Amino acid sequence: MKAATAIIDRRALRHNFQQIRKFAPHSRLIAVVKANAYGHGLLETAKILNQADCYGVARIGEALMLRSGGIVKPILLLEGFFSASDLPVLVANNIETAVHSEEQLQALENAGLERPIRVWMKLDTGMHRLGVRPEQAEAFYRRLCACPNVAQPVNFMSHFSCADEPDSGRTEVQLACFDDFVRGKTGEQSIAASGGILLWPQSHRDMVRPGIIMYGVSPQADLSLAADHYGLQPAMTLQSSLIAVREHKAGEPVGYGGAWVAQRDTRLGVVAIGYGDGYPRSAPSGTPVLINGREVPIVGRVSMDMISVDLGPQAADRVGDNVIMWGPGLPVEKVAACTGISAYELITKLTSRVAMEYIGEEA
């Protein structure tokens, strides 16, 4: 009998990677492994995805963990460096960086580096989060071209705000803005992340940046467009065990606050997982889990270490039986729809006490 465990399927990760190759056959792939590879384990996932052309991370610490773990392929800091003191570290470890601000540009201009750094100028085409505004972009670009600490040519990237919405006109506007700026320039281009890869093939360019789809999760909220619609397989199964099976009478409440009351005699199961493991405390009664091949609903409030589920009056489930919170047979997208929490957040917020197990052949 096991407590909360995240089982990561190497075969699913590799399958998804090859599916993405089919979606963007003329682009190279930046495997986005930030945030502990979306909860799948940073270094292990990078090793599984050893056919990636580059790895994308958010923080310099993530990049250094990859390097210390033996990863030698290019690594790109998607948010860029945070201070001038990071620059020698980037040089020493051959790490590429996004550049999106005047402060970063000045740090590059003023640094004394042993060799130039490969940079990606980030253009704000409409996300309005990071990036150089279009009206300032040409002057910014000229300074990057003139900077001896910048390896030439300068490369270009941006990020869509609504790529997971196929009917949104914003993506076309952003792409047109990007194209207007990069036209006639020689650097590599990257603008498509997961949504762009699936829905906007005209955005694929030199490199694409798969994130959530690499882990077998759809970026779209519509459950009819979950990962299996695109031939993707869930790489993570979050599971635990029944630690108690109890008779429960009609009219009896369960859990903190007595928020759920049984309408009939039934059998309740107690599962060893809770918000202390990263399972969402906000999951309402009715959120499904999978036990012995059937969905059963959570009842009552999620506790720190446990949830209760209504097994049904005739249930034959026993202590020790496996319980799947999400994975094959119960897509995380469905749990996300029930809880009101995005699938991105569900898979990345698991806590350190959740055990990690990897299945499938190693590379």
Curated annotation (Swiss-Prot):
Isomerase is among the record's keywords: yes
SMART domains attached to this UniProt entry: Ala_racemase_C
UniProt pathway: Amino-acid biosynthesis; D-alanine biosynthesis; D-alanine from L-alanine: step 1/1
This protein's record includes keyword Isomerase: yes
Catalysed conversion reaction: L-alanine = D-alanine
Cofactor(s), names only, from the UniProt record: pyridoxal 5'-phosphate
This protein's UniProt keywords: Isomerase, Pyridoxal phosphate
Binding site for substrate: R129, M304
Residues annotated as catalytic: K34 (proton acceptor), Y256 (proton acceptor)
Gene that produces this protein: alr
The protein's Enzyme Commission number: 5.1.1.1
Known role: Catalyzes the interconversion of L-alanine and D-alanine. May also act on other amino acids.
GO annotations of cellular component type: cytosol
Protein name: Alanine racemase
Origin: domain of life: Bacteria
UniProt-listed CDD domains: PLPDE_III_AR_proteobact
